[in-house]
Swiss-Prot record:
Family membership noted in the UniProt record: Belongs to the alanine racemase family.
Gene name linked to the record: alr
Gene3D superfamilies found in the cross-reference section: Alanine racemase, Lyase, Ornithine Decarboxylase, Chain A, domain 1
Positions where N6-(pyridoxal phosphate)lysine occurs in the chain: K34
Domain of life (superkingdom): Bacteria
Pfam families xrefs: Ala_racemase_C, Ala_racemase_N
An example Gene Ontology biological process: D-alanine biosynthetic process
InterPro entries: Ala_racemase (IPR000821), Ala_racemase/Decarboxylase_C (IPR009006), Ala_racemase_C (IPR011079), Ala_racemase_N (IPR001608), PLP-binding_barrel (IPR029066)
Matches recorded under CDD domains: PLPDE_III_AR_proteobact
Name of the protein in question: Alanine racemase
Length: 364
């Protein structure tokens, strides 16, 4: 079979959650599994993370998918609801909602629900995306407190905009704003994402929201080294993306390789054609020199990434054969490195894996 393969190590996924819980024993873990479990498979990840205290998803469709397969854990929908039909489904399926705009408050007031709703009030402390301003939040909180449609206490949350930056000034300001505005509010609090989890221990409050770190990937990329050793020691990559060599060619000096003739052989040399391309989710903008792992050794990508194939330099691997597995990222080759080479972030690479890729689960 020549399809690219994403091998998902569910044991590593469980291990990563246990590490998070051990590092924040006083907090409950709200596992972020939005965007198809960060590309790892929504249902697969939810079933593996049964020890999570709750799940976070982006939209109601993701939440309903989990309920349909029998996931009974609390689920919080980060974008909340947008009409009466959705709101009714929230109540029917026991979904928690993030309340971030006045339209949602109005819907709550005019809709008769069959059961009360668990909600989190989102306070915008500086992300300037979703949420009520610091100035608006006390009034909205008091308004929600009077609603018979809402379970008490009301959750209180914010989102950190710059927690992966070594300059802590803005994030510390956000945390200060949040603590100040919620000082007289009663309810569970949640502040940190994966980066905040490591960098801001003072913000490890009632609930933490680990995302990318669940999948064994640093939220800091490769440029922020303060937590590099800790992350590498305690967390394991969950996804390994691999593909097979489908052809080996001996090329002459100055022969060009791939579309656009952007790379030429510096000498007579062997190259391998690997069965993966941007049609599978491998980044088209990965440049020549981007590493892959073949038989435990690094080989460089050469030429442009095609829809279905890439070419790699085999000069360091004269014994490579058709059928050998090539690791594009994962165990032995962090996806953060590939993201850096391609000028993007690991999150994007994981979420762009396409349906053509075969997913395999292992326990290792």
């Amino acid at each position: 079979m020549n399809r690219a393969t994403a091998t998902i190590n569910v044991t590593a996924l469980k291990h990563n959650l246990s590490q998070i819980k051990a590092l924040a024993p006083k907090s409950l873990a709200w596992a972020m599994i939005k965007s198809n479990g960060y590309g790892h498979g929504l249902v697969r990840v939810a079933k593996a993370l049964s020890d999570a205290n709750a799940f976070g998803v982006a939209c109601i469709d993701e939440a309903l998918t989990l309920r349909e397969v029998g996931i009974k854990s609390p689920i919080i929908v980060m974008k909340g609801f947008y009409n009466e039909a959705e709101l009714s489904q929230f109540a029917r399926h026991r979904l928690g909602a993030v309340i971030h705009c006045s339209d949602q408050v109005s819907l709550l007031e005019k809709t008769n629900l069959t059961s009360s709703l668990s909600v989190w009030l989102k306070i915008d402390t500086g992300m300037n995306r979703l949420g009520f301003s610091v100035e608006q939040s006390p009034a909205v909180y008091n308004q929600l407190k009077t609603s018979s449609s809402i379970q008490k206490p009301i959750g209180l949350m914010t989102h950190l905009a710059d927690a992966d930056n070594e300059n802590k000034t803005f994030t510390e300001l956000q945390i200060k704003r949040f603590f100040s505005v919620t000082e007289k509010m009663i309810g569970p609090k949640s502040i940190v994402n994966s980066a905040g989890f490591f960098a801001y221990p003072n913000a490890l409050v009632d609930w933490i929201r680990p995302g990318i770190i669940l999948y064994g990937i640093s939220p800091f990329g490769i440029n922020y080294n303060s937590f590099k050793e800790k992350i590498e020691k305690k967390f394991r990559p969950v996804m390994t993306l691999s593909a097979k060599i489908i052809a080996i060619k001996n090329r002459r000096q100055n022969d060009s390789v791939g579309y656009g003739c952007t790379w030429s052989c510096p000498e007579d040399m062997p190259i391998a054609i690997v069965s993966i391309g941007y049609g599978d989710g491998y980044p088209r903008h990965a440049p020549s020199g981007t590493p892959v792992l073949l038989n435990g050794k690094i080989c460089p990508l050469i030429g442009r990434v095609s829809m279905d194939m890439i070419a790699i330099d085999l000069r360091s691997q004269p014994n490579a054969q058709v059928g050998d597995d090539v690791i594009l990222w994962g165990e032995g080759l962090p996806v953060e490195i590939i993201a850096e080479k391609a000028g993007t972030i690991a999150y994007e690479l994981l979420c762009k894996i396409t349906q053509r890729v075969q997913f395999i689960e292992i326990e290792k």
